[in-house]
Amino acid sequence: MSNVIIDLKNIDITFTQKRRTIQAVKDVSIQIEKGDIYGIVGYSGAGKSTLVRAINLLQVPTAGKITIGEDVTFEDGKVQLTTKELRQKRQTIGMIFQHFNLMAQKTAYENVAFALRHSKLSNEEKDKKIRGLLELVDLADRAENYPAQLSGGQKQRVAIARALANDPEILISDESTSALDPKTTKQILSLLQDLNKKLGLTVVMITHEMQIVKDICNRVAVMQNGQLLEEGSVLDIFSNPQEDLTQEFIETAAGIEDALAKINAQPLVKNLPASALLVQLKYVGSSTDRPLLTEIFKDFGVSGNILYGNVEILGDTPVGELVVVLDGDSDKVIAALKAIENAGVSLRVLKKGAQ
């Protein structure tokens, strides 16, 4: 039996506005497996939110095929489920948004209860479930508070509890942390990770922030202008991006752009000696364990002056990055570069010394 829970094949979504045709999503194919925390990342207008609305047919595609679990929901230009079946299928998918969409005149308890208004549970069973959900999101003591009495993070926790009320298999997060401060964002992401593990929940993260993808996701799709640019494991995408936009997202998340701007302003780099190179090194996995700069100095007499360094853990794999000035005899520097690449380290020359 396939472990794929969301299967999008060749999805097109087209709108017509004022006699103008807009293709919001163009021939996108994605497979998401049960238990994934899957990121769909792109700038505003990339088509990511439109695509994800098609997953539960809040937006009907123009073409392609969508399978959720064992059910084909859309194919050959037509919805494949009856109205009742579609409603039941949507209950297997919870959604949370940037704006929490809580009812201001209802308490946290009542907001969660609203999602169970069509449930066949008894009142006693509903009460037990609501209180259990509020405890799950660490809001058991806030059940009687109104939204105005809650912080942004607490409001999002209520929204998450409400989204889980009908025991969904999938939780879609559409920019759910965009309105939150960095500390609260980390807390919400940690909660989503816990729910993923405790409930076996498949989480789809729609975001424009690669940092969120790095923090929580195991797989990612990068979108631009309605098209899928590249897709893969977070480790593969971060360690070896194939597209310029992906590289841009990664550099923003790592802070390398700002670091390079400051590095290039340093006198050492501005007046780089003729014998020197400014290089960027990327390490993945076991290659982070080697004292590489020590080795190339010992073997080739080439010095390495570290101007920037960063090591992170993606999944269980360390990924490191260094910006280094290598200096030595020309032939020795060339030999050192080859040794670095042979060690499995990605290398990019940023600047050559003045000749």
Curated annotation (Swiss-Prot):
Main location: membrane
Substrates-to-products reaction catalysed: L-methionine(out) + ATP + H2O = L-methionine(in) + ADP + phosphate + H(+); D-methionine(out) + ATP + H2O = D-methionine(in) + ADP + phosphate + H(+)
Keyword tRNA processing set for record: no
InterPro entries: AAA+_ATPase (IPR003593), ABC_transporter-like_ATP-bd (IPR003439), ABC_transporter-like_CS (IPR017871), ACT-like_dom_sf (IPR045865), MetN_ABC (IPR041701), MetN_ABC_transporter-like (IPR050086), NIL_domain (IPR018449), P-loop_NTPase (IPR027417)
ABC transporter domain location: 8-250
Keyword annotations: Amino-acid transport, ATP-binding, Cell membrane, Membrane, Nucleotide-binding, Translocase, Transport
GO CC terms of this entry: plasma membrane
Topology class, membrane: Peripheral membrane protein
Organism domain of life: Bacteria
Example GO molecular function: ATP hydrolysis activity
Its job: Part of the ABC transporter complex MetNIQ involved in methionine import. Responsible for energy coupling to the transport system.
Assembly and binders: The complex is composed of two ATP-binding proteins (MetN), two transmembrane proteins (MetI) and a solute-binding protein (MetQ).
Full protein name: Methionine import ATP-binding protein MetN
The species this protein was found in: Streptococcus thermophilus (strain ATCC BAA-250 / LMG 18311)
